[in-house]
Amino acid sequence: MAIMAPRTLLLLLSGALALTQTWAGSHSMRYFSTSVSRPGRGEPRFIAVGYVDDTQFVRFDSDAASQRMEPRTPWMEQEGPEYWDRETRSVKAHAQTNRVDLGTLRGYYNQSDGGSHTIQRMFGCDVGPDGRFLRGYEQHAYDGKDYIALNEDLRSWTAADMAAQITQRKWEAAGAAEQDRAYLEGLCVESLRRYLENGKETLQRTDAPKTHMTHHPVSDHEATLRCWALGFYPAEITLTWQRDGEDQTQDTELVETRPAGDGTFQKWAAVVVPSGKEQRYTCHVQHEGLPEPLTLRWELSSQPTIPIVGIIAGLVLLGAVITGAVVAAVMWRRRNSDRKGGSYSQAASNDSAQGSDVSLTACKV
């Protein structure tokens, strides 16, 4: 079965880079797929996206006119027609498996045919600065909840409930973990190395955050200080507030890191402070693009470099253009990417000999 996202890929490359290639830090490749049933309105919708680090590089949408796996970055456009034909065949096969799994899982959970249900899947691998394998992932979810996941040892499964144990027994009998491990430690790593080389100008860059602070009166006695970080890459960043040098984590409102729409990211952290005491508070920003951490303090003469109204309007527009399905898939990805167990439907690499990134085909649940 393949994993589904709350109501809302797979790639394999045959090229390999020499192990002498090194990068600044660790890197990851992730594929996320979501199938959503829609009773009375035709076949389930299937969306698959692939990420190298924080950059989406491929996408498939069964509702799109092209019905093809498509590049999402310029450096993927160098792949030839045979590559895209192979990836499209593989991702369509995965979509078909999910259609079957949706019916199977309804039976496992004794659900009626009338409601809409989802399957999500996330899989991928991480490499270290030397390009060598660090860890692999394979997770599945049903209706937004963990279903089954490949354990950190890549040899066994964790099932979330009695229904998932049925799938676990099937996959253990089929040797699914061994197939996944071979892909994750082999072709997944080779593909990631190749993408890092082909897209190095984008993937291996660091853009330092542009920072500023805004002040928003809450009442006659309190105000909100908001610390902004804009235009940074990669997405990993730390924003913290201190009062007189003491950490204010519990009193901090912190939003998830958000894509800016131009390949960079934005984030803010806010605290409510007594009016007139603003200068006791400092915001601390850490990011690999900075030579050293930044410390910001509100001054009465401070003016935001970007009007807050414009930023909020931009974020609203960004939310409007991103489809709900992909947003849900990404949210599920971030929630699960650092966990060794989640949900997932096993993929048997029927096409792995041909080097298809999507050849980690989902086994039926």
UniProtKB/Swiss-Prot annotation:
It comes from the Eukaryota. Disulfide bonds join 125-188, 227-283. Residues 115-206 are annotated as: Alpha-2. GO terms for biological process: antigen processing and presentation of endogenous peptide antigen via MHC class I via ER pathway, TAP-independent; antigen processing and presentation of endogenous peptide antigen via MHC class Ib; immune response; positive regulation of T cell mediated cytotoxicity. The keyword Transmembrane applies. Residues 207-298 are annotated as: Alpha-3. It is a single-pass type I membrane protein. Residues 343-359 have a biased composition (Polar residues). GO terms for molecular function: peptide antigen binding; signaling receptor binding. SMART domains: IGc1. This is Popy Class I histocompatibility antigen, A-1 alpha chain. The lineage of its organism: Eukaryota, Metazoa, Chordata, Craniata, Vertebrata. SUPFAM superfamilies: Immunoglobulin, MHC antigen-recognition domain. It comes from Pongo pygmaeus (Bornean orangutan). Residues 1-24 form the signal peptide. The modification Phosphotyrosine is found at residue 344. The chain crosses the membrane at residues 309-332. Residues 340-365 are annotated as: Disordered. The keyword Transferase does not apply. It is found in: Membrane. Residues 299-308 are annotated as: Connecting peptide. Gene3D superfamilies: Immunoglobulins, MHC class I-like antigen recognition-like. Glycans are attached at residue 110. Heterodimer of an alpha chain and a beta chain (beta-2-microglobulin). One of its GO terms (cellular component) is phagocytic vesicle membrane.
